[in-house]
C-alpha cells in the first residue's frame, strides 16, 4: 500500500461519516470540514488551499469606519433593505472611477457578501420568464454558485472557456442561447481559479449576444482589477477594469469586499444592477409578485426574504473603503498585489512540473 502523510483509512472513515458518495463532488466547505476532522484525529497539520484566505490584514480604512459606526450605536438599528445611502453613492462612483460606466446609486444594492448577491440574482433572473429556466456558466468559476442552484432546484448548463477564446466564443455561446431557455449567463473576471482574464473582444461578444437573446449577464468581479499586468488602480483614469457593462444594458455587476479589500469576515458586497434592467418589468415577475421591476423585486421581495438587510456596520466600512479608493486616497490594489505575485510563482511551478512530466 502506498505510504501517505495521513493514513488512508482515517480519511475514508471521515468521508463515510459525512455520507459523501462521490468525494470529487464535495463542496469546498465539506472538504474543509473533513480536513479539519482528519487534522484533529491525526495530529498532522494540513495546508489549507481549498479556501481563498491569503492571510492579508483587513483594510484599515474599513475597520476604522466600522468601529466608529458601532460606537455610535448603529448595531441597534435595522439597516434599510435598499442599503446605506452613502454606500450606494460610493458604489456608483466606484463603478465610474474604475470601470468607466455610469450607474445610478439606486441600483447599487448592499448584500451579505457576493454569494448572497449571486443567490438573489439567480432567483430573480430565473423568475423573469417561465420559458427561461436555465443558468449558463462560462467556466471555470466559483463552484458554490452551482451548489446554490442545486439548493434552489434550478437548472444550469456549463462549458469551459479554455477551447473557446476569442471569436470562437461567439459560436459556442450562441449554441446555448438560441435554445431560448437561458435566463442568465455568469462568469468570473478576473477568473479564479485559473487566473485568466476575458478580453474586450470576448466581453463584447457576451454583451451583444445577451442583448440579442435578451439574457441577463451576471459579472462576478470578486477579484476586481487584479490583472496585475497593467495598473488599474488609478480612479477615473484609463486603463479601466474591463466589463460587459460597456456592451449591454442587461447586467448585474457583483462587487465583493472579501478579496479586493480583504474584508471577508464581515460578509459585505454590492450587487450593481444596470439602470435599464433595474426599471424593467417582466411578465414572470408580475405574475408571481403582482408587479414590480427587476430591481424592486430583487430588493424588496427576494433579498428581503433572505435577510432583513445587510450588516449595518459593515456597510459603513464598505462605504469608507470605496470612498477612499474613489478619491485616490487609498490604493487598495497595492495591499493585495501579493495575489499576483503568488499566482506568478504558482504558474512557474506548474509549468516546471509539466516540463518534467514530458521528459
Q: What are these regions, as identified by a protein language model?
A:
Residues 4-11, 17-116, 167, 322-326:
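N-terminal small-domain helix-loop-helix segment of the aminotransferase-like
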Residues 30, 86, 90, 301, ...:
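A non-catalytic, amphipathic alpha-helix used as a structural packing/dimerization or gating element
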Residues 31, 49, 66, 91, ...:
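Generic structural signal for small/hydrophobic residues in well-ordered secondary structure
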Residues 55-59, 193-196, 225-227, 260-265, ...:
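Short catalytic/ligand-binding loop motif for oxyanion handling, primarily in non-cytosolic enzymes
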Residues 59-63, 150, 228-232, 264-267, ...:
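Short aromatic-enriched loop/helix-cap "lid" or pocket-rim segments at secondary-structure transitions
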Residues 71, 75-213, 218, 224-247, ...:
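Conserved core of the PLP fold type I
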Residues 357-359:
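Conserved small/polar residues in nucleotide/adenosyl-binding loops
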Amino acid at each position: 500500500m502506498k505510504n501517505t502523510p495521513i493514513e488512508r483509512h482515517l480519511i475514508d472513515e471521515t468521508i463515510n461519516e459525512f455520507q459523501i458518495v462521490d468525494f470529487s463532488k464535495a463542496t469546498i466547505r465539506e472538504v474543509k470540514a473533513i480536513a479539519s476532522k482528519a487534522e484533529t484525529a491525526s495530529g498532522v497539520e494540513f495546508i489549507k488551499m481549498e479556501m481563498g484566505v491569503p492571510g492579508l490584514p483587513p483594510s484599515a480604512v474599513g475597520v476604522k469606519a466600522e468601529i466608529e459606526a458601532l460606537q455610535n450605536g448603529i448595531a441597534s438599528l435595522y439597516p434599510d433593505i435598499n442599503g446605506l445611502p452613502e454606500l450606494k453613492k460610493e458604489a456608483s462612483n466606484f463603478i465610474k472611477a474604475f470601470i468607466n460606466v455610469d450607474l445610478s446609486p439606486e441600483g447599487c444594492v448592499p448584500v451579505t457578501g457576493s454569494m448572497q448577491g449571486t443567490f438573489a440574482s439567480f432567483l430573480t433572473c430565473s423568475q423573469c420568464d417561465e420559458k427561461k429556466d436555465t443558468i449558463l456558466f462560462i467556466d471555470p468559476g466559483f463552484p458554490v454558485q452551482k451548489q446554490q442552484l442545486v439548493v434552489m432546484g434550478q437548472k444550469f448548463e456549463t462549458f469551459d472557456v479554455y477551447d473557446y477564446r476569442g471569436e470562437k466564443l461567439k459560436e459556442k455561446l450562441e449554441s446555448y442561447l438560441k435554445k431560448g431557455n437561458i435566463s442568465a449567463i455568469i462568469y468570473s473576471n478576473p477568473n479564479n481559479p485559473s487566473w485568466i482574464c476575458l478580453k474586450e473582444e470576448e466581453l463584447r461578444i457576451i454583451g451583444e449576444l445577451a442583448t440579442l437573446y435578451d439574457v441577463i449577464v451576471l459579472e462576478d468581479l470578486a477579484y476586481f482589477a487584479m490583472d496585475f499586468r497593467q495598473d488599474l488602480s488609478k480612479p477615473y483614469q484609463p486603463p479601466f477594469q474591463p466589463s460587459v457593462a460597456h456592451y449591454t444594458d442587461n447586467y448585474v455587476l457583483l462587487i465583493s469586499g472579501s478579496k479586493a479589500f480583504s474584508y471577508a469576515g464581515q460578509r459585505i458586497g454590492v450587487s450593481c444592477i444596470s439602470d435599464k434592467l433595474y426599471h424593467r418589468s417582466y411578465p414572470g415577475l408580475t405574475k408571481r409578485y403582482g408587479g414590480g421591476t427587476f430591481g424592486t423585486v430583487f430588493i424588496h421581495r427576494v433579498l428581503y426574504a433572505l435577510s432583513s438587510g445587510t450588516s449595518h456596520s459593515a456597510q459603513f466600512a464598505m462605504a469608507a473603503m470605496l470612498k477612499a479608493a474613489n478619491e485616490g486616497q487609498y490604493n487598495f490594489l497595492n495591499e493585495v498585489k501579493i495575489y499576483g505575485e503568488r499566482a506568478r510563482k504558482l504558474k512557474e511551478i506548474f509549468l516546471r512540473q509539466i516540463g518534467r512530466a514530458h521528459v
